[in-house]
Amino acid sequence: MTKLSKRVKAIQSKVDRNKFYPLEDALNLVKECATAKFDESIDVAVQLGIDAKKSDQVVRGAVVLPAGTGKHVRVAVFAQGEKAEQAKAAGAEIVGMEELAEQIKGGKIDFDILIASPDTMKIVGTLGQVLGPRGLMPNPKVGTVTPDVATAVKNAKAGQVQFRVDKAGIVHASIGRRSFEPAALKSNLLALLEALNKAKPPASKGIYLKKVAVSSTMGAGVRVDQASLQAAA
């Protein structure tokens, strides 16, 4: 049996895994349990009332978190001409066409988000085997294939996060860092939940947002009371 460290034991003693905590209490508790020697990510897991095996119930989208993510995001853009200049002006670190495609094929991927103008998808489409497994393939459903590349770059820089339900019907996302104030984490979480509600598939029946839990990178999961979420919305 693996021996638990004092830090892990201390965390486990603070969190009642059978309890549903009011939203503010849950966020404060997660911050309190984030005791690692780095600025831990604060994450959320949302169990949705869908059948993830059915194609008409796949939940996917993107949302700009009002308080940002606390991360510096490097953005690459496939664009040419005026759109390339607009992307650069908006803050994109990398802008290109064929040369950028060759770099990606060669394994040089020094960006976090890839955006593409629709007229470049003939080139981008050849990169699916490289970008797909890394979750970097541009997609119009999350706003990364768009004629308005400048706005897409600004959104990425402002703290946009992409979400997609996994095979278990759960959406995982980061809503900030331990250094964030509880109010900032709260506003980010509520923005994410609002986006999830807007992305609800028509085929979904019954309770849609079934369970919500927050955690830090090295901390325990804290379940959130649904009534407190509805009151805060």
UniProtKB/Swiss-Prot annotation:
Keywords annotated in UniProt: Repressor, Ribonucleoprotein, Ribosomal protein, RNA-binding, rRNA-binding, Translation regulation, tRNA-binding
Single biological process term from Gene Ontology: regulation of translation
SUPFAM superfamilies: Ribosomal protein L1
One Pfam family linked to the record: Ribosomal_L1
Entry GO CC: cytosolic large ribosomal subunit
Stored InterPro entries: Ribosom_uL1_bac-type, Ribosomal_uL1, Ribosomal_uL1-like, Ribosomal_uL1/biogenesis, Ribosomal_uL1_3-a/b-sand, Ribosomal_uL1_CS
Gene Ontology molecular function: rRNA binding; structural constituent of ribosome; tRNA binding
Family label: Belongs to the universal ribosomal protein uL1 family.
Function: Binds directly to 23S rRNA. The L1 stalk is quite mobile in the ribosome, and is involved in E site tRNA release.
Quaternary structure and interacting proteins, as annotated: Part of the 50S ribosomal subunit.
Listed PANTHER family: 54S RIBOSOMAL PROTEIN L1, MITOCHONDRIAL, LARGE RIBOSOMAL SUBUNIT PROTEIN UL1M
Protein name as it appears in the record: Large ribosomal subunit protein uL1
Source organism of this protein record: Polynucleobacter asymbioticus (strain DSM 18221 / CIP 109841 / QLW-P1DMWA-1)
Gene of this entry: rplA
